[in-house]
């Protein structure tokens, strides 16, 4: 909201667009007021649900569901300025969606966004680029079907304490410290 309210409204037509956790888009003037976000359910109920549509290389916000015999195009969009946080938006998913619409957007592309959310892949890239990074190991959900093998692999490579973190959640979500085997089993 701060970024939107500080853009040059004389130069740009700024259209607020909210993406819900259910992956539904909403627009409306109330999205410009930070205080409205205190009650998301009420804010959404006071906003217009829309979808993004590309038609003949132009992008539009279109009322959803469509209304018969009514103007359904809410606005044309020239560029998206995604200011987002969380799953399906920081990881390249939103950027990929915008790319499928051929809708220009600011910020990282699909690859860079995905890489930025994948802690293991980012670590490998940084290491290959010559940056000092701590050693690590990665395990898949399939690997965890045999937890004893995972624990043995960790213990053969590292001394306790060890830090366990999900590969692709937010920067500190799900991180735990294991001081011993019992702690590692819980992590």
Predicted feature locations:
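ATP-binding N-terminal substructure of ATP-dependent carboxylate-amine bond-forming enzymes
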Residues: 1-111, 115-121, 128, 140-152
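Structured loop/turn residues at beta-strand edges in well-structured enzyme cores
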Residues: 75, 131, 158
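An N-terminal domain-start capping segment
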Residues: 112, 186-187
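Acidic/histidine-enriched active-site and ligand-binding environments that engage anionic O-linkages
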Residues: 151-162
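Basic phosphate/pyrophosphate-binding loop/patch that engages nucleotide-derived ligands
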Residues: 125-133
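Charged helix-capping and loop-helix junction motifs
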Residues: 148-153, 177, 181
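Glycine-rich phosphate-binding loop of ATP-grasp-fold ATP-dependent ligases
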Residues: 133-138, 162-186
């Amino acid at each position: 909201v701060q970024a939107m309210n500080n853009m040059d409204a004389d130069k740009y037509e700024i259209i607020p667009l909210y993406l819900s956790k259910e992956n539904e888009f909403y627009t409306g003037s109330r999205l410009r007021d930070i205080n409205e976000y205190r009650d998301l359910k009420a804010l959404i109920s006071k906003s217009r649900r829309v979808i993004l549509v590309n038609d003949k290389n132009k992008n539009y916000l279109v009322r959803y569901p469509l209304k018969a015999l009514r103007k359904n195009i809410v606005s044309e969009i020239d560029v998206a300025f995604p200011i987002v946080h969380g799953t399906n938006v920081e990881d390249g998913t939103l950027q990929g969606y915008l790319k499928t619409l051929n809708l220009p957007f600011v910020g990282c592309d699909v690859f860079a966004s995905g890489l930025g959310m994948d802690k293991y892949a980012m670590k490998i890239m940084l290491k290959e680029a010559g940056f000092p990074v701590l050693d690590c190991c990665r395990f898949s959900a399939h690997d965890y079907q045999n937890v004893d093998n995972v624990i043995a692999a960790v213990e053969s490579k590292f001394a306790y304490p060890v830090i366990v973190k999900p590969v692709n959640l937010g920067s500190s979500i799900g991180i735990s410290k294991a001081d011993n085997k019992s702690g590692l089993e819980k992590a």
